[in-house]
From Swiss-Prot:
UniProt KW rRNA processing keyword: yes
Reaction(s) this enzyme catalyzes, per UniProt: pseudouridine(1915) in 23S rRNA + S-adenosyl-L-methionine = N(3)-methylpseudouridine(1915) in 23S rRNA + S-adenosyl-L-homocysteine + H(+)
Broad class of enzyme this protein falls into: transferase
Entries under CDD domains matching the protein: RlmH-like (cd18081)
Protein name (database record): Ribosomal RNA large subunit methyltransferase H
EC number, as in UniProt: 2.1.1.177
Similarity-based family: Belongs to the RNA methyltransferase RlmH family.
Organism: Lawsonia intracellularis (strain PHE/MN1-00)
Main location per the UniProt record: cytoplasm
Binding site for S-adenosyl-L-methionine: L74, G106, L125, G126, N127, I128, T129, F130
InterPro entries in the cross-refs: Alpha/beta_knot_MTases, RlmH-like, tRNA_m1G_MTases_N
Keywords: Cytoplasm, Methyltransferase, rRNA processing, S-adenosyl-L-methionine, Transferase
Pfam families assigned: SPOUT_MTase
Length: 157
């Protein structure tokens, strides 16, 4: 199994302690097998309109991307896949490219179209809406689950 890294670009800090603790729990578990880097983009100014805020956040996300990154958006309009399909999705990137998968999670209002338009892929966590803090934790759990599936470690039932 390759030990390539992955990256997560997120809008906003996890301000509530239990979200931070849950995210740290999964970062720690994932990092036993794979380097995972997080870049936090500052939330847009709350005095701006929703579209202005998303545009500002989008501009900052695009500026944070590195040449090695393969941008993959997490968005409600993205493709919904199973945990096993997600594990295979990651395996494909780790085994078939020299670049790093870079998952992008927007803020409270989602991602600006400028970010979605440059993404290689766009995935959804399902048809229901989550607070962006919970979406981050769910995504990290799915990365951990994918790693256990790829390594045949009992976790996914």
């Amino acid at each position: 199994m390759s030990s390539k890294s992955l990256r997560l670009i997120v809008v906003g800090r996890l301000r509530i302690p239990f979200w931070r603790a849950a995210a740290e729990h999964y970062y720690k578990r994932i990092s036993c097998w794979r380097a995972i880097y997080e870049t936090i983009i500052k939330d847009g100014n709350s005095s701006l309109s929703v579209s202005q805020r998303k545009a500002m956040e989008g501009k900052n996300i695009l500026a944070a991307l590195e040449p090695i990154d393969i941008p993959i958006c997490l968005d409600e309009k993205g493709k919904s896949i199973s945990s096993q399909e997600f594990a295979n999705f990651l395996r494909n990137y780790f085994e078939n490219t020299t670049k790093r998968p870079c998952f992008i999670i927007g803020g409270a209002f989602g991602l600006d179209s400028s970010v979605c338009n440059i993404a290689n892929d766009c995935l959804s966590l399902g048809n229901i809406t989550f607070p962006h803090e919970l979406a981050r934790v769910i995504f990290l759990e799915q990365v951990y689950r994918a790693e256990t599936l790829l390594r045949n470690i009992p976790y996914h039932h």
